[in-house]
């Protein structure tokens, strides 16, 4: 099939590479404009653009995809279907109607659950045991189109946003390459989403990362994993921000106030939660590098009874 591919971050690269490998003709890649990075302000290609350039595919980077000029540019690229994966701009109905098969979106959740911008983080934070990707026929709403195809995956107890993202990136490529032949053969049956079963995965913010030790150890562990590597979970220790990169929820019984350091071991320390405790394994004190708790404890004399969060 002739395809115009729309996407921007790493998540979309898996699908683009899979479509190229399957032999589809990618007539153009549409992605966000290059962004300045670091103190130098040097412009950096979006990951999808890097992939397109590597394969010699034309790249179109409109600041606003809805303008008449952008739409006229899109019309220059022949396409049976537009494939969209984390593009970052909302498409107008005029664009949705351009290709023969419309626009298909690769969404990183099992719709109708977790519509919105942050489904991967949210499924971990909420304690889901299963997620996946949905191939959806796009309409003018936000992730509200008819579902065409789904692939599921289990969420491991140690999965972080980073590891689950990478699994779903691969799964998205598998799903779209399995769905397209069925679409062309007329074997996909659109299924309307049940709005009663939906929930919205709102944008993740840095403020969400502050650990509230009045929650259970299991809840805190899920928050840490869901926000690793960005924006990261954190607390305060001796007046400085302390990022917690890895911890293990423990069923430790105690009577201490939430946030109290219960025990200090050679390679970890335990912090009281409302139920159970967090065994901190990897962390980063403000102004320092990320390190194991073992290395941290070699330089900092952490004492039982101290309180995190102050």
PLM regions: where:
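Amphipathic, non-transmembrane alpha-helical secondary structure
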Residues: 13, 17-21, 72-75, 93, ...
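Residue-level detector of anion-binding/catalytic polar loops
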Residues: 25, 58, 130, 241
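Donor/substrate-binding cores of folate-linked one-carbon enzymes
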Residues: 22, 32, 81-200, 205-207
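N-terminal glycine-/serine-/threonine-rich beta1-alpha1-beta2 phosphate-ribose binding loop
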Residues: 36-80
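Short active-site oxyanion
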Residues: 1-4, 79-82, 209
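An anion-binding loop in the catalytic cleft
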Residues: 213-310
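Internal alpha/beta domain cores that form substrate/cofactor-binding pockets in large enzymes
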Residues: 2-4, 27-28, 58-77, 90-108
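N-terminal Rossmann-like dinucleotide-binding module
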Residues: 1-40
């Amino acid at each position: 099939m002739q395809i115009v591919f729309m996407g921007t971050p790493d998540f979309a690269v898996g699908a683009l590479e899979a479509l190229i490998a399957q032999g589809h003709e990618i007539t153009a890649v549409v992605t966000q404009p290059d962004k300045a990075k670091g103190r130098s302000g040097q412009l950096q290609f979006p990951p999808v653009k890097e992939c397109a350039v590597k394969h010699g595919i034309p790249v179109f980077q409109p600041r606003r995809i809805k303008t008449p000029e952008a739409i006229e540019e899109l019309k220059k690229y022949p396409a049976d279907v537009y494939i969209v994966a984390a593009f970052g701009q909302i498409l107008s109905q005029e664009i949705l109607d351009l290709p023969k098969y419309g626009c298909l979106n690769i969404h990183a959740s099992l719709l109708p659950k977790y519509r919105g911008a942050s489904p991967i983080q949210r499924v971990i934070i909420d304690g889901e045991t299963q997620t996946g990707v949905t191939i959806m026929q796009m309409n003018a709403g936000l992730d509200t189109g008819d579902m065409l195809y789904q692939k599921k995956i289990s969420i491991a107890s140690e999965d972080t946003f980073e590891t689950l993202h990478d699994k779903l990136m691969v799964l998205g490529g598998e799903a779209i390459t399995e769905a397209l032949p069925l679409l062309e053969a007329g074997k996909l049956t659109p299924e309307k989403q049940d709005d009663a079963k939906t929930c919205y995965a709102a944008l993740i913010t840095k403020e969400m990362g502050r650990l509230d030790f009045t929650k259970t150890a299991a809840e805190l562990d899920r928050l840490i994993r869901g926000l690793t590597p960005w924006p990261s979970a954190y607390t305060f220790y001796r007046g400085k921000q302390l990022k917690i990169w890895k911890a293990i929820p423990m069923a430790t019984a105690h009577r201490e106030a939430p946030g109290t350091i219960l025990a200090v071991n050679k390679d970890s320390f335990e912090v009281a939660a409302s139920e159970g405790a967090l065994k901190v394994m990897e962390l980063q004190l403000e102004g320092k590098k990320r390190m194991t708790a073992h290395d941290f404890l070699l330089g900092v004399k952490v004492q039982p009874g101290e309180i995190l969060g102050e």
